[in-house]
């Protein structure tokens, strides 16, 4: 039986994520990038849900959030010892807030 962390991911999942980042950073493997995006889609959904009652469709917010996720994946350095979700959350939120700002809406 594997030990689960508070987030519900097993230690194997975290190690697999680290390995995908190493592979992506070393070889620019598009398959590794795609797997990283797919494995973090729930993070984008969770963060986009915080803004869903602001007059924008959830699908649009998630699309903007995915742009932030892609930026975070491209900029993340696994050697720094930081969890990816900790690194990616401000980038995803920033993209969503920028979307509202560009439309002229105030988000607090």
Task: Label each PLM-derived region with a short phrase.
Residues 1-106:
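Alpha-helical promoter-recognition and RNA polymerase-docking modules of transcription initiation factors
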């Amino acid at each position: 039986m594997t030990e689960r962390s508070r987030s519900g991911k097993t230690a194997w999942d975290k190690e697999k994520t680290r390995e995908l980042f190493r592979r992506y950073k070393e070889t620019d493997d598009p398959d590794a990038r795609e797997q990283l995006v797919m494995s973090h889609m729930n993070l984008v959904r969770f963060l986009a849900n915080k803004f869903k009652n602001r007059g924008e469709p959830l699908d649009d917010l998630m699309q903007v959030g995915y742009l932030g996720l892609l930026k975070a994946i491209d900029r993340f350095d696994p050697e720094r010892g930081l969890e990816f979700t900790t690194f990616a959350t401000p980038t995803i939120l920033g993209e969503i807030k920028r979307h509202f700002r560009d439309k002229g809406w105030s988000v607090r």
